[in-house]
Structures are given as C-alpha cells and as structure tokens.
Amino acid sequence: MNEHTVKAFDEDIGELRGLIAQMGGLAEAAIDASMDALKRHDLEAAARIIDGDKQIDELETEVERLAVRLIALRAPMADDLREVVAALKIAGVVERIGDYAKNIAKRVAAIDGHSVIEPLSLLPAMANMATDMVRNVLDAFAARDPEAAVRVCEQDRAVDDFYNSIFRTLVTFMVENPKSISQAAHMLFIAKNLERVGDHATNVAEMVYYAATGDHMGDRDQGDTVPLAGS
Amino acid sequence: MNEHTVKAFDEDIGELRGLIAQMGGLAEAAIDASMDALKRHDLEAAARIIDGDKQIDELETEVERLAVRLIALRAPMADDLREVVAALKIAGVVERIGDYAKNIAKRVAAIDGHSVIEPLSLLPAMANMATDMVRNVLDAFAARDPEAAVRVCEQDRAVDDFYNSIFRTLVTFMVENPKSISQAAHMLFIAKNLERVGDHATNVAEMVYYAATGDHMGDRDQGDTVPLAGS
C-alpha cells in the first residue's frame, strides 16, 4: 500500500468506529429510556423508543455499506481485514442490543407498576449493570484495549447472578400473586432481555480482543443463562 | 472479469451456499431433537444438542472466512457482492437459530414432563411450524426464489398466533398450578425461542428477497411478539 492508500484506509476505519460508537450510544440510551418508561408506565415514551430503533438499524446498514466498500476497494490484509470484519460483526450485535430495548418498550403497556412494585424495582439495577457493560466494551473497542475487553467478560457473571435472582423472585411473586402472573411473565422476559444484553456485550468483548490481538479469548461459557430446576 | 475469474467466483459462491445449507440442516435437526429430548426428559440427548452447536458455530466461521476471501480476492460488483453479503448475514442468522435449539436443550433438565403434560403438548407443533419456515427459506435461498421468500414471511403470522395462544395457556396453567410455575416459566421461554426462530426465518426471507431482486420486501412488522396486557 502507498501512503495515500494507508491514509484513506485509516479514514474509512475511523468512520466505521465513529458509526459504531454512535450506534452504541443510541442503544444504551434506549435501554435506559425503556426502564424509565417502564417505571412511569409511560406509553408515549415507549412508542418513541420503538420508533427510534429505526435509527440504529439505519446506522447498521451504513456500517455494512462502508465495510463492504472498504474491503472491495482497499483490499486490506491480515490485521486491517480482521478489524473491518470485527466492525461489521460488532455493528450487528449492537443492532440486536437496540432490539432488546425496543422489545422492553413494547412490554410497557402490559405492565402496570402499581401491582408489581416489588420485582419492578430490581430491573433498573440490572439494566444499569448491562448498559455499563455495553459502554465499557465500546470504549475497549475504541481504545483497542484487550485488557478492558477481558474485564467486560468478568462483569457478565454479576449480570447472570442478578438474572438468576430476579427469576427466583418473580417465580415466588407469581406463586403469591396469581392475579399478576401475566404481568410477572412480561417482567421475566424483560429480565431475560437484559441478561442477553450482557451476553452480547461479552460477545463484542471477545471480538474486540480478537481484533486487537489475533488470539481468541478462550472458550468461555456463552449463551442463555438457565436457572436450575426447582429454583 | 475474464472467464476464469467468473468461474472461480461461481465456485466460491456455490461453496458458500453449500455451507449455509449444511448449517441450516443442522439447526433444523437440533430444534427437532430438542423437542424430542424435552418430551422424553432425555438429559443425555440434551447434552448432545448443546455440544453439537459448536459444529454450527464452526461452519459460520468458515462462511465468514470464505466470504471475506471472496470479496477481497474477486472484488465482486453489484449483484454478486449483494449475494456474498447476504450469505454472510444469513449464516449469522442460522447460527442464532442453532443457539435457540441449544437454549431449549438447556431447559430440558428444568422441566419434568409429568407435571406439565398439557402445555408441553403444544410446543412440538409450534416447533414444526418454525422449522418448516427455516427449511422453506433455505430452499428459497438455494433456488434464488423471491416468491418462495414472500410465502415464508406469510407463514410467520401463524407462528406468532400460536405463540400468543401458548402464552395465554401457560399463564392460565400457572394460575391453576402454582407449584409448577417455575417449570411453566421455562416453557414460556421455550415458546419464545421458537417464536424467535420464526422471526429469524422471516429475516432470512427478506435477505433472500433482497439478494434476488435488489428490492426490499417492504416494511413488515418485525421483532418480538408481545401478547396484549391482561391476556
């Protein structure tokens, strides 16, 4: 590559990083806003979150277009190619995090805070832990910091523990409040969505680690957290 | 492109299609097997499904490697590039469908068929509808058939209706059987996983349509199905 090509590549990859940071900021804000709408049973705010998800989707399309153009025109090799592919995949994951915020917003109408006060108070704390992971992992991506990525993976254990505790709390709540079972079931899905946000942040952390080092972080346990039977 | 390049591209894209067909077959079989393990409370079969998911993940990595090589070396334009990007994204979605089978398998231990016979009988029928969509959409991809892709999207409505009906059945069951609430909650997640399989097949259908025609199928309602409050 000549100097001009290198500079053009750096500009493109900088643009990719900027788009992903923008997506991440929107996804994080959408999750915070969904918790707020839930607490206040604010249907208008929920509708805005659902509608706002389109913006994240559009940014993902822009990332794809740019990444494909970059691969096709600049034919990056090794490290650079690994970084473009990581950006493409990270954008896909952040888009899914945005979808979780949208899904939570869709449940606002189904949950009336007054009748399910107790378990409702646990969700925002869990949401904070999950969005914290998203923020940290995107910072790690921007800084190409593999150590920060490892720390994000460690945070995921706390989110999983929190999820298991909410699952048990909600099942107990259902047993004691059969009239609120439908609402509690919706809250169970919200807790699961937040747990998945943590999983996705972990996935991104692994991609950041791989893009920065060329090595895999090792076979960590991924995927759905299933509390033990009878819990 | 000269004749040699065209032929090499066709071979590569054929290999991509073959890998995706293989992934789809494995994902479909994993969902069927998870229903079977659930009905028979077969923990060994469940463990095999969980372990087998790695194979689908490895195939996705192979698709990525091949697609990136194809874009970088052959620099495909317009229609061809659209098809490679579609293949890349479709592989990602099929990998997620495999994850749902794994997640269902993880819940086998938490569900004892004897105490939840009634709602348990509904899940395999829903699973059949969802895997039918997966099979049809991968056939549509192999045949580059946009009309078949549209039909897959239409099938998704039936899966969503089924999900809403299972949600109501399970909530009623929980009210009447407070001791089985934890198990019923796991079944709710299984039903939700199957509903998401249908959504993902719909996403793939839209990619197949776009890859084949260059047009978007139109703004269909996507994402999480949330039954109405009080249902």
Spans of model-derived segments:
Chain A
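Cytosolic, long alpha-helical scaffolding segments
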Residues: M1-S231
